[in-house]
Amino acid sequence: MYKRQIQDIEKILDENNQELAFEPIDFGYMINGQSNKGTIGGYVACNFAGSRRFKVGSVRDHILGFKGVNGKGDIIKSGGTVVKNVTGYDLSKLISGSFGTLVVLTEITLKVSPKKQSQITVIVYSDEIKKISNLFDKILSSSNEVSAATFIPEEPNHKNYEHTKNKIFKFNDLDHEGSFLAFRIEGDKRSIDERLKELKIELDLSNFKSSILDVHQSIPFWKKVNNLELF
């Protein structure tokens, strides 16, 4: 399983209405426009995670256990296959992000989450960093469970960057002006509608130009954000 490509695992989970909550990222699209076909072992070794990280943590926060071999040839086992209280050292957090220097992974057990029923993304247009920063602070402290947020600055001197960004908005049939903040709300439709209503008041969105990406627009947008195609 540690050699299994992450895209294959995501496909299997999707067929069962589940997902990896930490949102795997794929740097291959940024470099050559196609997947780098990373393995689950590679993701754990590098501890890479996508846009939900500030809410659900990184890969290391979703490892239940692992088996591996250290530099002396000793077999190492840590954790288990279920979520429960345990004692001793949490080696899973130690090996995550160690880039394979501590142990060669042979088996990994990860937590998975129910797949979110739907999502929307709110785009807030502004070139004023102070205002954007204040919005970020409010989003982070909000009880309305924003699952992702990012700031995309305008870069007029970087034509490829602006071209990629404009393609996203052309696909979404939206006008694009300057820099913008994007944040995502996930869950069932009723919950999304209620939280959006509260966030509009909480963030004073009436003072900003804004637009909304529906679920079919939001999913590819965050794929490109997670894969660093918009940066």
Predicted regions and their residues:
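FAD-binding glycine-rich core of flavoenzymes that anchor FAD
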Residues: 3-93
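Short, basic, low-complexity termini and linkers enriched in Ser/Thr/Gly/Pro
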Residues: 1-2, 210
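C-terminal substrate-binding/cap subdomain adjacent to the FAD-binding core in PCMH-type
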Residues: 45, 64-230
